[in-house]
């Protein structure tokens, strides 16, 4: 294209854009001004690299290639226009467009006359939008100056998961045309990502020495301040948020700020400490899991032994019941045999009597057959002289006590069931209802010995906040009553009115300087005296022996050393007055 003046820009650097209008066929500008005779410049909007003496494509001779591109005889120079679009994910990208819609061999390049107004870009910090697309207004949270913005550090954040998921995708080079290559670095100054080929100017050129190269970044807008549109290069330690340099002088004025690199190093140290603590906790949990696996085996073995004992005892019980049953059965059989023997004796006696009666009957039948009357009478007289009536048959009564035996056995069964149920209920409720595993009352690594030695005597005093009332209760004699010093109001705690009271309370023994409780609006820390930290407005300025800071001893990094006990860093120190009234010696 002869004498063409093309300019490529993505809007990242407004200074690099060339706002000149395309020249007409005669070589003059469309607005009538004189054409610029300087060399054409091609500006890379991503890297800011400007090369002189180069044009888009090869130069066309006069009259060549015109008929191939345009059907009419009118020669119109190409108009290159960049359109910025925003997709659903909020990512910005640029494309080239023209009025007639003819596409060049290059991706996004359109040739033809432009009937649309030129692309205009907003000022820095404002959202740049395309006039060829529907306007998309971003949702920006307006924060008033001085308003505190704190991070809550949630355990699981969907935005963090989305960023991690998007970060796993490949970042493409912004300078490649057509087949985009994978980006290897991103430049914060150019706000673009480059592949190995397009990264060479940043590595070799002297103009790009000050450019900061990072790992490929997908969303550069996330690194910009939502209020000012500048890159967030600072970190506010007061509000725990990333800010730009304009925020440091406006919303975060007089706040403690550091660079994001320093804040990252500090947070990485904190993160490493948390990882070590989590690793120690994981090791502790794994040890507990191993211990509980052994306990599970012990529980199974113990339960198996208990089942064996149960089976053995109930087998013995059933065997004893079988013995008792056999004894009752033997008694029944013995009684049956005795009764049968008695019946046999009775039957034998009756058979003997029946035999005698049969003999008497036969004698009388023989006498009845005598035909001689004299002989019959003589024999009859002799028979009747010894005759007597047969005695009556003996009577017997059989006692069948089956119902009585059944009632006795029923009572025995009820008694056995009652005794068995009573013992089984006792075993189930008293012995078997107790769980194998019982949760301890002291948890979270608490010092059991320390807590047990004092909670029994002070009740619920451990829930008292860090105020003067909490620590003043320990300033009384160790053996006396635990009466805390409670002033009526903080304003009465002045040095003039309470100096005498504190001297009487603490004593004057030793070389300690008398100090009293003072009410201050803010907690003031002193290097030589301990102070009570927290939400309290009181600062403790007592004797050095009244409160001491426990410095933990250096221990090797083992899983046991990670267990911190309750009140291991800051414990109240009791005063032992001893025999003297004014003594404040340490025990």
Swiss-Prot record:
GO CC terms, sorted: cytoplasm; lysosome
Ranges annotated as B box-type zinc finger: 220-260
Principal location class: cytoplasm
GO MF annotation terms: identical protein binding; p53 binding; zinc ion binding
Modified residues (Phosphoserine): 21, 28, 58, 104, 489
Pfam families, A to Z: zf-B_box
Stretches the record annotates as Disordered: 1-71
Residue numbers of Phosphothreonine PTMs: 476
Tree of life domain: Eukaryota
GO biological process, one term: negative regulation of protein localization to nucleus
Effect of deleting the gene: Absence of TRIM29 enhances macrophage production of type I interferons and protects mice from infection with influenza virus.
Coiled coil: 259-348
Function comment: Plays a crucial role in the regulation of macrophage activation in response to viral or bacterial infections within the respiratory tract. Mechanistically, TRIM29 interacts with IKBKG/NEMO in the lysosome where it induces its 'Lys-48' ubiquitination and subsequent degradation. In turn, the expression of type I interferons and the production of pro-inflammatory cytokines are inhibited. Additionally, induces the 'Lys-48' ubiquitination of STING1 in a similar way, leading to its degradation.
Assembly: Interacts with VIM and HINT1. Interacts with IKBKG/NEMO. Interacts with STING1.
Name this protein carries in UniProt: Tripartite motif-containing protein 29
Annotated organism of origin: Mus musculus
Gene: Trim29
